[in-house]
A protein has these predicted regions:
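Short, well-structured N-terminal submotif of metal-dependent ribonuclease cores
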Residues: 1-40, 53-66, 136
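Short beta-strand scaffold positions
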Residues: 6, 39-40, 77, 97, ...
Length: 136
């Protein structure tokens, strides 16, 4: 079964109803109907929370976070091993640390697909399956 890895940029496109929001909704629906799995790293989840709080305030942040992920989705903790893997990706491939956590999750198997609107991942698309949402 496919496992989608959601990047914060994809989630924010969804909230903004931006380019690719419909694709993110398809991914969320596939997870809710158990046709696919969905994961997001705790660091990416935190990025989403911070951006929502800054834009909408605390009460809307919590409401929006609760509305995003189906209960079947998994927020993956930043373990010591994951932190070391992400650090290596950050240094070796010159990507942001939080992005390295998402990339590390996407590298778990050939059935994992990172969904993102961040074209900075083009520099590492040789390491994992990456689905890029349309440019704005």
């Amino acid at each position: 079964m496919i496992t989608y890895v959601l990047d914060s940029s994809a989630a924010l496109r969804y909230f903004d109803d931006g380019a690719g929001a419909d694709r993110v909704e398809e991914v969320l629906t596939a997870c809710a109907s158990r046709r696919a799995n969905l994961t997001i790293s705790a660091l990416q989840w935190g990025e989403i929370a911070g951006k929502l709080r800054k834009r909408f305030g605390e009460s809307d942040e919590i409401r929006l976070l609760n509305s995003l992920l189906p209960s079947e989705a998994t927020v993956v903790s930043a373990t010591a091993d994951r932190a070391v893997h992400a650090a290596a990706l950050k240094v070796d491939r010159n990507i942001a640390y939080a992005d390295a956590f998402a990339l590390d999750l996407a590298r778990a198997s050939p059935e994992h697909i990172l969904v993102t609107a961040d074209y900075g991942f083009k520099a590492v698309d040789d390491l994992a399956r990456i689905e890029f949402l349309p440019a704005k």
